[in-house]
């Protein structure tokens, strides 16, 4: 280690306090972040003669500096550790993708509540059910509630402005509260039953509906009895189609780990209100060679730092850190217990989660092998490095220009890395200051903006740069690279073939190599076509959104007397410009701040 850092002295001065430690390499990069109840004991353990694994030994051999942060408690250390892992993404930590928040099913607090798919903070008023493992599970549940309880799903602005019921009412999926086709008390009762159903009281709800049906029939209220009979029939079908288990009403997450072929899968299954909502596989980075229990623990620590901790966790492996669940419970303000040898239905859940983990891993390995084979084919065709590490690190960027008659010109850049597209790295560039429709000038501008950052050391240089175009576009790209002092050998144009058919493209090079036609059967060309088509799709969607936004906003802005606040009220009331356009003069005048005279001007301007 360098003279300026004295390891022996550093370890001697460490306190017996909780905190977070960081291992740094010669370049000052953080290689690993960990937490400790006792910093002195934990950090010192890394420098003993025997270490837990060869991977840890390899990391320790590269450590040239240590940093620690003392915290007030181990729970605080856990929070800091997770924040640092997410922001720094150290290469020796097991990393799980920072997934977007899980979806919920929301029953709103409206006078006539609606059921809705919801993602975000749960601090707003309403009843939240979930979280669900994916959007499909939420939407399936909404369909069940529509069939059984006929609750509305329309936006409040649409609900407030309906004069006749929609198609969902006609097909028996909504009771029509927008036109008072159902009594307020009956609708409220249906909402309560739906909430109880979601909380796992399906059998009790069924019994209640049956009792009310018998009562209505006995009192000769046959129409009401028929509605309740149909509701009971729909609920009965749901109960036969789905497994509803009575497990004391405790929400449960089931976690199973499978490993093979150098990859690991952590499968998370969710059970809410006795209903198995499905599962979701996670594939961590930097987990090769790690014990399954360590991977599971890393998942739990990272996942439940940001997501709801359920009362019960059913796990395929015991946790090495016995204090972890206590820390997460303290952070969440709720108690949680871990079961590693479950019985009864929970055992079947774990067995199913384990099978699904193994199946997801097998699919991922098959897909990964196929993707790697395509990358290898491309590298061989273009004479690039073909060793495994180089192929995994091969970064391909593709640029495309999109506009309509010169309006809303945008350039797109999509990125292929680790044998797959990387949407989080995509970028759009608004093109300005050029003659409308000049694609060459647009390409020059986007390439200059992107690759000037490479020469400044602010961005990585791709191994391959694809240009959607032929000789003209490639020549523009070559000029930009020469001006910036970059290797023109990385530039490849994708010239469209006859009839723009996939498989007939020709590759055009900037370094005087002869054009290359790989042919329809080439896996390399299929990969190039995929990246090129993704760049085109990304550019088109961005251009359309930009053009639509400009046109929609400008139409209202051009109307005298419609300022920002009135425009906002109109769009909110009618759910967008199309709603404003279809509104009558009387409807427009009902909006706060819109007089009858102004409503007529708005109507005339939009028609």
UniProtKB/Swiss-Prot annotation:
Domain GIY-YIG, residue spans: 16-94
GO biological processes: nucleotide-excision repair; SOS response
Pfam families named in the record: GIY-YIG, HHH_5, UVR, UvrC_RNaseH, UvrC_RNaseH_dom
SUPFAM superfamilies: C-terminal UvrC-binding domain of UvrB, GIY-YIG endonuclease, RuvA domain 2-like
Residue intervals of the UVR domain: 203-238
Gene Ontology CC: cytoplasm; excinuclease repair complex
Alphabetized InterPro entries for the sequence: GIY-YIG_endonuc, GIY-YIG_endonuc_sf, GIY-YIG_UvrC_Cho, Hlx-hairpin-Hlx_DNA-bd_motif, RuvA_2-like, UVR_dom, UVR_dom_sf, UvrABC_protein_C
Any one GO molecular function term: DNA binding
UniProt KW keywords: Cytoplasm, DNA damage, DNA excision, DNA repair, Excision nuclease, SOS response
Chief place where the protein resides: cytoplasm
Transmembrane segments: none
Compartments it resides in: Cytoplasm
Coiled coil: none
Subunit structure: Interacts with UvrB in an incision complex.
Function: The UvrABC repair system catalyzes the recognition and processing of DNA lesions. UvrC both incises the 5' and 3' sides of the lesion. The N-terminal half is responsible for the 3' incision and the C-terminal half is responsible for the 5' incision.
Family statement: Belongs to the UvrC family.
Stored NCBIfam families: PRK00558.1-5, uvrC
Protein name: UvrABC system protein C
Organism (species): Bordetella avium (strain 197N)
Chain's gene name: uvrC
